[in-house]
Amino acid sequence: MSKRVKGSAAQTSAAYFTAWQRGDLRTMATLVYQPPADFVTRHRSFSDDLHVQDIQLRPGAVKSTGETSAEVPFTGSRTLSEFGAWPFSGTLRLAVRDRTWKVLWAPETLDPRLKDGGTVRLAEFDGPAVELVTSEGDKIPNDSYAESYLAELKPEFDEVSQGWALESALPGQQARRLMTVEPKVSLERTTLSRSVQAAAARALDGVRDASIIAIRPSTGEVLAVADRLEGNYSAFRDFFPPGSTFKTITAAALLESGLDPAAEVDCPATYTVPNFRPIKNAGEQAHGRVTFADAFAYSCNTTFVREAVSRLSGDDLVETAAKWGFGGAKLATGLGGNCGRMDPPDGTNELAVDSFGQGSVEATPLCMAMVAAAVESGTLRVPRILSKAAAERIDGPAAKPVDLDEGAVAALREMMAAVVDHGTAAAAGLPAGVSGKTGTAEAAGGREHGWFIGYRDDLAFSVFVRNGGSGRSAALPVAARFLNGI
């Protein structure tokens, strides 16, 4: 090489890397052969657009590629404010131009992804700032059958959080994400229990048009809501005849009127209310002379009709139902919801059919789980699916807990235990310690809704199978799968 060439490839590359490290763009430009007019602006914009805080460069050894050309491989790392260290590598090419060693600059010298018109950009994207999780802080189980309820809750926590993506693209091609910082998400705990919710969901696998609601009686927290009801029905809001599960409330009214659980009553297959139609037991079964507790266990329609029309007025039944949540305001669960409703019976005939959960009596599956929880705890509490503060923010203050008649509640506990021990829920595969009440409700078109409500320790529940058949045939197997799966 001619001795008249100024400097060397090593000297020029070292000066270039030193200036680049310092951010001395103008000195860098003097070392480049025919730098583009926007050389300084291009470097500055690249750093500004990507929020580069600093750069570290590690040049390799100079490699000769000819008598008047050389190259220097290098690695580096840019620190981006959103991502931290972002490593890159490249090659600095040099050649003798005008008897001086110069840098042959190209866009890929700045960053290899800029070759062939490529671009690198920092993109912002929004994501939810809040994720609804179980009471334990875990993700809601997949296929939980609570998805529609969670989707309804999410707008109540509609804050957004910003995420960042570092993207590169070639002309005409889709951008590729190089690095991502997901939006920061805070966890909003629901009251749903992971294990209880999972058990409820799996119990409904393969079951159409059904729901399971589980509540913690001591607090009113909703532990599970698994809803496969069809036709946009909601287990929180829509009303259905509760059938014989309503006998829990009729029994409470009769107990408060003075009827003792041990009192002997008649349970004929059929009973005709004077000047009204005959009322029949399921399957027209007769149990003869039994205790009132066993009439409840056997779900004797005839007993309940006879005792209700002889001991209660329509107002008595309505007032008792009101104590148990019927006819009240919407429930401040965090998702709203209803309990039950009934019209004041107009005479003995309407009182008769209302007494076993037909006629004007309707309830939501949530309501009947609430009733079961009240038997276990002795207190009627409004269920909630969120923290007290969150539920109140969304729905307003919840009604205060109401303590129920201690004597009636104590008797109902024994009577619901008898249902499982030797009544309509006996030998159904339920785990030990379950108390409950079956229900079969007449529905349109001669069909039947199946119900089973109950509790075990500090867990109360309702199982509802719409148009599925009797409580024993449709709801009990689902309840057994649910409770055995917890």
Predicted segments — roles?
Residues 137, 200-204, 220, 238-266, ...:
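Active-site SXXK
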Residues 241-292, 298-301, 313, 324-328, ...:
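Short, glycine/proline-biased beta-turn/loop segments that scaffold the active-site neighborhood
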